A protein has these predicted regions:
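N-terminal loops that bind phosphate or other acidic moieties
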Residues: 2-64, 69-132
Length: 132
């Protein structure tokens, strides 16, 4: 068994990131589902869909949910699903997702930490020299 991965984002952002990560890695080693939330959708209906995905993905080791924007509808849906077998990380980016997919044998807690680190480490500013 391994941790399941549920990606909840605005529109097709999650699907696009997952497709790109699979091309980069050549595989998707975790059981993964994406849920794209349309802009004008009913959050309660989307919560039901997310719960269905969660049931499919939970195989005993937990589920990691990645969302794109803290405080948004996808993030709010994910926060309602959080429990002792479900971890939620916001701020999804491609480096975070690739990091998660690179460690399919980690525990839920370890994978959540890898996700957070991968997301942070993937942000590298290239700033112009400060004016003198």
């Amino acid at each position: 068994m391994s941790v399941g991965l549920l990606i909840i984002t605005h529109g097709d952002i999650g699907r696009s990131l997952l497709d790109t990560a699979v091309v980069v890695m050549g595989t998707c080693p975790l059981q993964t589902e994406t849920l794209g939330i349309p802009m004008a959708s009913d959050p309660d209906q989307q919560l039901e869909r997310a719960q269905q995905y969660l049931q499919q993905l939970e195989q005993g080791d937990g589920v990691l949910i990645l969302t794109d924007l803290y405080g948004s509808t996808p993030s709010n849906i994910a926060s309602k699903l959080r429990n002792d077998k479900v971890a939620v990380i916001t701020g999804l980016n491609l480096p975070m997702l690739i990091r998660v997919l690179n460690y399919p044998t980690l525990t839920l807690h370890e994978l959540a930490e890898k996700a957070t680190g991968g997301g942070r480490e993937g942000i590298i500013p290239f700033m112009p020299d400060a004016p003198t």
